[in-house]
Design a protein with these regions (language model features):
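Helix-hairpin-helix
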Residues: 1, 26, 114
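Acidic, metal-coordinating catalytic segment for phosphate/diphosphate chemistry
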Residues: 50-176
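N-terminal regions immediately upstream of nucleotidyltransferase
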Residues: 1-5, 132
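Active-site gating/metal-coordination segments in enzymes
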Residues: 263-284
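Non-cysteine beta-strand/loop elements that form the S-adenosyl-L-methionine
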Residues: 86, 210-215, 275-282
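Active-site nucleotide-donor binding segment shared across nucleotidyl transfer reactions
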Residues: 9-51
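An N-terminally biased module of ancient metal coordination in phosphate/nucleic-acid-related enzymes
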Residues: 27, 162-261, 270-271
């Protein structure tokens, strides 16, 4: 996700800057913020779609492209990432965005439930079987509302009960950056970090954190700056003294402990038990 997201955002900006574009958004697995994404899905609304697809095909990041059409265009970036651009008239943008945001499982369940209610859902609109009429919506909120659901955030659309929750008003609120109360993995100058305990704690406090775990590398991770067991005992005492000074944040004594080839950890059990937080990590030998 961290590699493909900048590509998607750059192309979305390019679409939005074109005079023929009314709206453009990232869709697909990128919009759902899945850990891995195989390609980029972009959707846009335009009354002159051919001008828009022809322009995006010539973007500086694009190495190859299919034939631009009024429906969209397929692209490949210089780094080999596939891009699928879909275009619809502005009145159908909500339908297109909902459909191509996925997931496939979420959409399949949504369609199945809609059919049971006499409706057919696609990127082209919602067709009422009784009247034969197809309704178009400019926003996803309207799409879900027409089907009897609260709006479902893209990150929740994985067919894990979100439709039932959206129907009965019990969808969870997504975690946001302001909800993060602390950091549980950071290094200091004791191993390969660049800040002291005091500097790291001050930075964490400035972010509004309530706690910070110091988890320097352990004794045998193989990258230098090893921390011996004796030195880690001293570090525990240093952190206790720091907390006693009332620094406005709680610092936890921890370690990123190497998993040894035979499966054990490279600190004795009594030392591990004295820590507030232990991260077990594979570094070499596997």
């Amino acid at each position: 996700l961290d590699e493909i997201l900048p590509v998607a955002e750059a192309l979305t900006r390019a679409l939005r800057e074109h005079p023929a574009c009314e709206r453009a958004e990232v869709a697909g697995s990128i919009r759902r913020r899945t850990d891995t994404c195989k390609d980029v899905d972009l959707v846009a609304a335009s009354d002159d779609p051919l001008a828009l697809t022809a322009a995006i095909a010539e973007h500086r990041t694009i190495a190859e492209h299919g034939t631009p059409s009024e429906l969209g265009v397929k692209l490949t970036t210089h780094s080999g990432i596939g891009v699928d651009v879909r275009i619809v008239p502005p009145p159908a943008f909500g339908n297109l965005l909902q459909h191509f945001s996925g997931s496939a499982a979420h959409n399949a369940e949504l369609r199945e439930r809609a059919v049971a209610a006499g409706l057919h859902v696609s990127e082209h609109g919602i067709k009422d079987d009784a009247t034969g009429e197809t309704e178009l919506f400019t926003t996803e909120e309207e799409v879900y509302r027409r089907l009897g659901y609260d709006y479902i955030e893209p990150e929740l659309r994985e067919d894990r009960g979100e439709l039932d929750a959206a129907r009965d008003g019990s969808l969870p609120r997504l975690v946001e950056l302001d909800d993060v109360r602390g950091e549980l993995h950071c290094h200091t100058t004791l191993s390969d970090g660049t800040g002291t305990i005091e500097e790291m704690a001050a930075a964490a406090r400035d972010r509004g954190y309530e706690y910070l775990a110091i988890t320097d590398h352990s004794a045998s991770h193989g990258f230098g700056d090893n921390v011996s067991a004796e030195r880690l005992w001293q570090r525990i005492e240093e952190i206790e003294a720091f907390n006693a000074s009332d620094p406005g944040i709680r610092v936890l004594a921890g370690s990123e402990v190497n998993i040894l080839p035979e499966g054990g950890l490279d600190y004795p059990d009594d030392l591990l038990a004295a820590l507030d937080w232990v991260i077990a990590s594979i570094h070499t030998s596997f």
